[in-house]
Amino acid sequence: MGNLKGVRIAGTGSYVPERIVTNEDLAALGCDSDWIVRRTGILQRRHAEPGQATSDLCYEAALRCLENANVSVDEIDLILVATITPDHPTPSTACHLQRRLGAVAPAMDIGAACAGFMYALVTGAQFVSNGNARNVLVIGADLMSRTVDPEDKKTYPLFGDAAGAALLVPSTQDECQSTECNGSAADSTIQTDGLLAYQLGSEGCGGEMLCIPAGGSRTPITTDGEDSASRYLQMDGRGVFKWAVRVFDESAKDVLRAANVSSDQLSLVVLHQANQRIIDSAVSDLNVPPEKVFVNLDKYGNTSGASIPLALDEAARAGRLKEGDLVLLCGFGAGLAWGTALFRW
């Protein structure tokens, strides 16, 4: 648990591939479109074209983010890319992006799957908060359509491809000096910028619930094709559902308690867009009304590390976020790993 002062999100950006894959398209492959909607809330998703790689999506999202923040490539001090679908095992996708942008900045990948953007966000915020960087470009991006088996009718429909970006910069605010923060004098001691509270966690004992068994040093991919099924994402859907709901409930309450903020003070809740049933179940115990919960998984499906920044960018462009808003973010997924943070916009 921690908090980081002196940092804010100056801009966001996102990119999704042009190709839309609807539930009706998947029905032609043998998937049950009614089941998809009923069990997940997903209506369509985006798939990258052959030849498109993760860094290509990152590049487009980065350009839009920098433009939105009115920051030039030359001003970037650090690039962080959260992904589990890198262009290559090495070099990192962040280095591919750094080269293409023409930036002169260190760059590295962070691999925490659906929680990856939260890990990258907190990491980047550390650099800004302690004065070691002024402009940190944080990106979450995944081409999940390349990791799922088209023959797996229960898993293949869940995922899509996307990239989302946020630019972290220093903030000049420290403490609330008037009643303008939240409308009462009692709020005058609440930190008014940055990550008011965050929690990163992992439960590696549950790693097998959500994994790609082959392709690493433990189980290298062979040329005989015998390990073909192990190349794809394997998921214990029921187990992940129960774990995700529990870990969000616990971590969200911990974070709100640490920040001395109640759930009714929240302006917006942005969870990892995995499944509508998970989102509904997770927020119900917080007593957060549906209108304060941002959802776009119906359009994009589960985009893994891109999920939260994609949602943040859409929320910002839709006018759902204004200066001073309290935003609760939570990502959870393979590892098992999670990251929850309370951010003042």
Swiss-Prot record:
EC number, UniProt record: 2.3.1.180
Gene Ontology CC terms, in alphabetical order: cytoplasm
ACP-binding, as annotated region: 273-277
Cytoplasm among keywords: yes
Catalytic residues in the record: C114, H272, N302
Listed Pfam families: ACP_syn_III (PF08545), ACP_syn_III_C (PF08541)
Pathway it works in: Lipid metabolism; fatty acid biosynthesis
Catalytic activity, reaction form: malonyl-[ACP] + acetyl-CoA + H(+) = 3-oxobutanoyl-[ACP] + CO2 + CoA
Assigned keywords, A-Z: Acyltransferase, Cytoplasm, Fatty acid biosynthesis, Fatty acid metabolism, Lipid biosynthesis, Lipid metabolism, Multifunctional enzyme, Transferase
CDD domains: KAS_III
GO BP, sorted A to Z: fatty acid biosynthetic process
Main localisation: cytoplasm
A GO MF term: beta-ketoacyl-acyl-carrier-protein synthase III activity
SUPFAM superfamilies membership: Thiolase-like
Cellular localization per UniProt: Cytoplasm
Self-association and partners: Homodimer.
Entry function: Catalyzes the condensation reaction of fatty acid synthesis by the addition to an acyl acceptor of two carbons from malonyl-ACP. Catalyzes the first condensation reaction which initiates fatty acid synthesis and may therefore play a role in governing the total rate of fatty acid production. Possesses both acetoacetyl-ACP synthase and acetyl transacylase activities. Its substrate specificity determines the biosynthesis of branched-chain and/or straight-chain of fatty acids.
Notes on the domains: The last Arg residue of the ACP-binding site is essential for the weak association between ACP/AcpP and FabH.
Family assignment from sequence similarity: Belongs to the thiolase-like superfamily. FabH family.
Database matches in PANTHER family: 3-OXOACYL-[ACYL-CARRIER-PROTEIN] SYNTHASE (PTHR43091), BETA-KETOACYL-[ACYL-CARRIER-PROTEIN] SYNTHASE III, CHLOROPLASTIC (PTHR43091:SF1)
Full protein name: Beta-ketoacyl-[acyl-carrier-protein] synthase III
Organism: Rhodopirellula baltica (strain DSM 10527 / NCIMB 13988 / SH1)
